[in-house]
Design a protein with these regions (language model features):
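Haloarchaeal acidic low-complexity proteome signature biased toward cell-envelope/secretome components but also
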Residues: 1-2, 185-187
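Flexible, glycine/small-residue-enriched loop-and-beta-strand segment within the central core
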Residues: 2-143, 169-170, 177-178
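Conserved beta-strand-loop-alpha-helix hinge in the C-terminal portion
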Residues: 162-185
Length: 187
């Protein structure tokens, strides 16, 4: 397997009697305090910071970096070449494409009416080559289109079209400036 786990990690936390296996690809690095539940699969090159939680039924592609104190709360699909910075929260039923950057303390949500109604939980969909700035919030069910850029502190309440800049609270859409146009360079 050619992987490295620090002391104080839990790989294969059994959340119930039906819990399956964990599958980590080559060259995984799981740092101390991190918990990876059963029924998680990751491609090659997964690297975590300290105190990361990756819950059950999560699938991660190749070369995913998960920053310290990040929670991936289960039933999440993450593509390849993704950089998730410190303190990010990713709720169940979220889909993240390839070559995506999530800035520090970004928060994704999946419940449009917390404890008020019993609506189905719908996490955001983040398409390929998207960058999400620090402290941005994405509300339940929104889609951020490919090659878009969400500014720091933005609150995204509605879908962001491809190649669009979303800034402010609530986020307004602007044409993507030329210097932000193109693919993310995450390898």
């Amino acid at each position: 397997m050619n992987s490295e786990t620090d002391l104080g990690t839990t790989i294969g936390y059994e959340y119930g009697p039906e819990a399956g296996e964990v599958s980590l690809g080559e060259q995984a690095v799981i740092r101390s305090g991190s918990v990876v539940y059963c029924d998680v699969s990751a491609g090659d090159g997964l690297v975590t910071g300290h105190n990361v939680v990756i819950r059950e039924d999560t699938k991660l592609g190749d070369d995913v970096v998960v920053g310290t104190n990040t929670v991936i709360d289960g039933s999440v699909t993450i593509g390849s070449h993704v950089s998730i910075q410190t303190g990010v929260y990713i709720p169940p039923n979220t889909t993240i494409g390839d070559h995506v950057f999530l800035g520090p303390r970004a928060v994704l949500t999946n419940d449009p009416y917390p404890i008020r109604r019993e609506d189905p939980l719908r996490g955001p969909t983040i398409e390929d080559h998207v960058s999400i700035g620090a402290n941005a919030t994405l509300l339940s069910g929104v889609t951020v289109g490919e090659q878009s850029f969400v500014g720091a502190g933005a609150v995204v309440t509605r879908d962001v079209p491809p190649r669009t800049l979303a800034v402010g609270s609530p986020a307004e859409h602007e044409p993507l400036p030329e210097h932000l146009d193109g693919n993310n360079l995450i390898k």
